[in-house]
Amino acid sequence: MVSSQRNLKLVVAGLLLGILMSAMDNTIVATAMGTIVADLGDFDKFVWVTSAYMVTVMAGMPIFGKLSDMYGRKRFYIFGLLVFLIGSALCGIAETMVQLSVYRAIQGIGGGALMPIAFTIVFDIFPPEKRGKMTGLLGAVFGTSSVLGPLLGAYITDWFSWHWVFYINVPIGIVSLFLIVKYYHESAQHSRQKIDWAGAFTLVIAVVSLMFALELGGKEYSWDSLQIIGLFTSFALFFIVFIFTERKAEEPIISFWMFKRRLFATSQILAFLYGATFIILAVFIPIFVQAVYGGSAKTAGLILTPMMLGSVAGSAVGGVFQTKTSYRNLMFISVAAYFAGMLLLSTMTPETSRVMLTLFMILVGFGMGFSFSLLPTASIHNLDPRFRGSANSTNSFLRSLGMTLGVTIFGTIQNNVFKEELISAFKGMVGGQGNQFAGDPQQLFQSGQRSQIPEFVLDKIVQAMSTSITHIFALALIPIVISAVTIFFMGKERVEINKTIVKES
């Protein structure tokens, strides 16, 4: 597939750039949303900018993973890059919020192909004994990109304009495109096969319904509104139809027989659970720094750097030792560090020093990092190459689904706890200060408005925010404990050289 070691390194560089763009894109845009809304207006539509991207990414992952198994990795990776670049350029020139949302949907179609196919190409071009190190490298880039996004977004918005949050993808993508087109030569032969159109259609409708329900629920519409209930009902119905369709399809989008394999099934559960807990760290640690410590947006972004470094270390360790011991043993190290770090984060108060927060972040990042390199490898362990794309895209899909559900569920809980704490703190006081700040906590993030709040009032608000955030860190221990139990069932398998591959049963 690759003619020399030099070319191999260039292909890996091209894949890393693709992962860098797709993993960083949503978090880097989130930081710039305030500026974008101020420029384009239509505040009531800004949620669609994120929703449109996530919907098409999630819908595209399993479909492109399967298509890459059927017709080859290179053509669909290049397709994903081109669509992502076109979408990024269009986003940069958007003049209305509606235009930006449509262009983000286009961008998401490309993003849905980049991540799963990049990991699968690595499994194709490297022998088993080297895959661990390479997936560790790719996993480290994924973790770093996700955490680096908010910080980079803040700097780009401040020093240039929000347009460059999207334009920055263009030169990166062009370099990635050049490296893959020139140096990656796919040798596998792919016969023409029947595409599972019915499965693709029902999956897209199911995913779109679920994603819009999660993205719009509690924001555009209340959770018990007809719109949200209708979306959840649509998801349930089309997902059931999808399952029945896949059981009869010649080439199903998701091969459910793989879930009969213990290592594959447990890896998917862990991807979902780790995704659900990882996202709350990336979202709520910066909020804690800004609202509780009174830091700036840049300071909040920088505070994630220790977690980023910890995740890089964890991903590297997990990758290197895949051939030395079982996936289960390595994941036990992961979940132990992850649990300890999250537990320590749940004990924070407004008096907790930033040094201690930094140490907590390194520990939780180290535990989290293992999952970035181990779970994709475990998902394709001993699988026939023609199923790798589908297996890896399923893992990416479930991690992303976990992230979406996690930020929705934990975000709702945090908001409710914050309001309850404020009402309790200001109970019996005149003026309704608690209700005022429950409705507009943004005043805590702006130094000018924050300085105008009376000190005794500010102390109560800060304590309420601190309690609400540490409360969800404590609740996050539940899925982490479930992860620990799941790890027990992974078995003793590890990366072995010249191991017989498993075909469909």
PLM feature segments, named:
Residues 8-61, 99, 161, 198-200, ...:
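Transmembrane core module of solute transporters
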Residues 19, 81, 85-88, 103-104, ...:
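A generic transmembrane-helix signature of 12-TM secondary carrier transporters
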Residues 36-37, 67-68, 152-160, 214, ...:
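Interfacial helix-cap and linker-helix signal at transmembrane-aqueous boundaries
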Residues 45, 130-137, 299, 387-394:
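Cytoplasmic loop-to-transmembrane helix junctions
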Residues 61-198, 216:
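Helix-loop-helix hairpins in multi-pass membrane proteins, especially solute transporters
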Residues 144, 148, 357-435:
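Small-residue-rich alpha-helical segments with characteristic i,i+4
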Residues 171-188, 204-216, 234-248, 483-491:
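C-terminal membrane-cytosol helix-exit motif in multi-pass small-molecule transporters
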Residues 400-489, 497, 503-505:
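Hydrophobic transmembrane architecture of multi-pass small-molecule transporters
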